[in-house]
Amino acid sequence: MEQTRRARLTGLTAALLTVAAILWTLFASPSIGVVADGSYASAAEGLALRYAEESIPTGQRVEDFAYEDTAYSTLLFASRTSVGAAVALVRLATHPFGLGFSTRYLAVVYALLMGWGAYLLANGLARRSRTAAILATLGLPLALANPAVIGYLNSLYAVGASIAYLLLFLGATVYCLCREKGCGVQWTLLVLFAAQLMLRTMAQMMVLLPAAVLAVVLCAVHSCPGRAERPLHAA
């Protein structure tokens, strides 16, 4: 259908602009990052990472880390926050090749996740409102290219993960609810997956638990195959 094709094109445009804006700001501004302090070292330790250098002066920007011995399952399932899931992805792509960990790699993972969320959000909105889809497509890159946002993405702090997972959750919810009824339970599962990642980023995100539960319930009712509209037959 023409509407579906247009919605997909809008979503793809939003995704490309969002990822490009984040990565451009990240790599064009080498000074954006987090400086060393005691709490940052503790955050790294909780993710099986340590400073790549033996001694780093307090106040120096830190991006590079070395890996501690740990199992991937520990990062994925035993980590206190869902930041561990993103760190595990970076570790899987770098550690086997003898590469160290960089928060810039982590920022790229977050950028791709937010690109996915932007695609779902703009795709869903385009099925209902062209104006809303255009606003989302143009507004997301402008908002996310903020140096303050990039600073959190280029760090081990949970704020960066919460931003990425929140956008993925919003995009998945809007996409599911804007599709036709009875579109399939896989979209509800995507919303549930994004919700649990979002809620596990840090304790403060638990205030969104009621909204997450409501979104999952609404998506389940909307996407259930039994809810598909059936054509009326003349008597």
State where each predicted segment sits:
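Hydrophobic transmembrane helix bundles of membrane-integrated enzymes that assemble
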Residues: E2-S29, R80-A235
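Extracytoplasmic loop-helix module adjacent to an early transmembrane segment
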Residues: A20-H95
